[in-house]
Swiss-Prot record:
Originating organism: Rotavirus A (strain RVA/Human/Japan/YO/1977/G3P1A[8]) (RV-A)
Primary subcellular site in the record, as a coarse category: host cell
Protein name: Non-structural glycoprotein 4
Cytoplasmic side: 52-175
Family named by the database record: Belongs to the rotavirus NSP4 family.
Biological role stated in the UniProt entry: Plays an essential role in the virus replication cycle by acting as a viroporin. Creates a pore in the host endoplasmic reticulum and as a consequence releases Ca(2+) in the cytoplasm of infected cell. In turn, high levels of cytoplasmic calcium trigger membrane trafficking and transport of viral ER-associated proteins to viroplasms, sites of viral genome replication and immature particle assembly.
Modification after translation (UniProt): The N-glycosyl content is primarily Man(9)GlcNAc, with a small amount of Man(8)GlcNAc.
Length: 175
């Protein structure tokens, strides 16, 4: 385990790989050498990083299948990114989480639409009642049967006949 974290050991392995590649491929003008070296470096790094991580994860976790699946998906996604692909591999758990998030957001939006619709209906009903209260209704005949103080009211005919209904008929003075 100490050798896995040792930087000198890692650098010596990379140097050994490069020396081996140089000895195998004698032609210095070979065009594919940097690509091969890059792929081998990435594979070596993945090997050195994933083996101890998976050992620790398997010892500490209760569900080793999910850990292994997650590590493999991560390695495949890393290789796809290095190859230049934009697509990624996802496991069912991530898809289910995304679907749950989408369904939750849709429910939230439906509740908001329901609240807004209810408020709009209430506003329309309020505007209708305000409109009904503000509209004037034409009245042909005024019903005077509910009026008070009708005993002293003179009609228009008495006024026309020359008698003023507002003049007192008797004048009394106190002494």
């Amino acid at each position: 385990m100490d050798k896995l974290a040792d930087l000198n050991y890692t650098l010596s392995v990379i140097t050994l790989m490069n020396d081996t590649l140089h000895s195998i491929i004698q032609d210095p003008g070979m065009a594919y050498f940097p690509y091969i070296a890059s792929v081998l470096t990435v594979l070596f790094t993945l090997h050195k990083a994933s083996i101890p991580t998976m050992k620790i994860a398997l010892k500490t976790s209760k569900c080793s299948y999910k850990v292994i699946k997650h590590c493999i998906v991560t390695i495949i996604n890393t290789l796809l990114k290095l190859a230049g692909y934009k697509e990624q591999v996802t496991n069912k758990d991530e898809i289910e989480q995304q679907m749950d998030r989408i369904v939750k957001e849709m429910r939230r939006q439906l509740e908001m639409i329901d609240k807004l619709t209810t408020r709009e209906i209430e506003q329309v009903e309020l505007l209708k009642s305000i409109h009904d209260n503000l509209t004037t209704k034409p009245v042909d005949v005024i019903d005077m049967s509910k009026e008070f103080n009708q005993k002293n009211i003179k009609t228009l005919d008495e006024w026309v006949s020359g008698k003023n209904p507002y003049e007192p008929s008797e004048v009394t003075a106190s002494m």
